[in-house]
């Protein structure tokens, strides 16, 4: 067998992505323990895997990550935080990328089933994405403030209105790493459009 000094090509291309938000980034995770459990129940798959974490245990974990408070209004939303400050989750970025891939699919008519190909080739490598100030130099330690939002929903009993309190961070910057399968189907131009 011949020997070579050439390094094998990696299966993955890695990209560092920086996003500068213009305006507030609003939180989406409930702060009240009962609302956390209700959110998890709503998002639970129809077929729960045998080795899945039980919902009460998962709700307790999320409650700890958001600093849940029984006194918080049921409609209060906040961010997960660790000892260094609030953070965004990689799984949320992946969800945004999936939605965006659907929206820009028509830009790439030569790539059949663009969204499916994108979703199966692009992975967010960073689980906890810290939030930095707009200059990217300082980690954000606290929220910019809460905002009251008037919301309306249609229910079986008719339209309903309520107030929702949402923590927000003004114009944060985030940075994370994407791993893209290096098979030539999804490249930098696709990533820039998405």
Question: Where are these predicted regions, by residue range?
Answer:
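RNA-interacting cores
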Residues: 1-194
């Amino acid at each position: 067998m011949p020997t070579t000094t050439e390094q094998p090509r990696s299966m993955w291309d890695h990209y560092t992505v920086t996003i500068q938000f213009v305006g507030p980034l609003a939180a989406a995770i409930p702060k009240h323990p009962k609302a956390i459990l209700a959110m998890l129940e709503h998002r639970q798959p129809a077929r729960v895997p045998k080795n899945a974490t039980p919902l009460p245990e998962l709700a307790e974990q999320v409650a700890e990550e958001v600093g849940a408070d029984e006194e918080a209004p049921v409609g209060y939303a906040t961010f997960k935080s660790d000892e260094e400050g609030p953070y965004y989750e990689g799984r949320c970025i992946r969800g945004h990328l999936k939605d965006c891939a659907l929206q820009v699919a028509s830009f790439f008519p030569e790539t059949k089933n663009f969204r499916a190909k994108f979703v199966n080739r692009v992975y967010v490598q960073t689980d906890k994405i810290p939030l930095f100030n707009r200059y990217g130099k300082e980690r954000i330690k606290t929220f910019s403030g809460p905002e009251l939002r008037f919301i309306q929903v249609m229910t079986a009993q008719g339209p309903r209105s309520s107030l929702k309190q949402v923590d927000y961070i003004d114009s944060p910057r985030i940075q994370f790493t994407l791993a893209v399968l290096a098979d030539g189907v999804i490249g930098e131009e696709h990533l820039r459009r998405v």
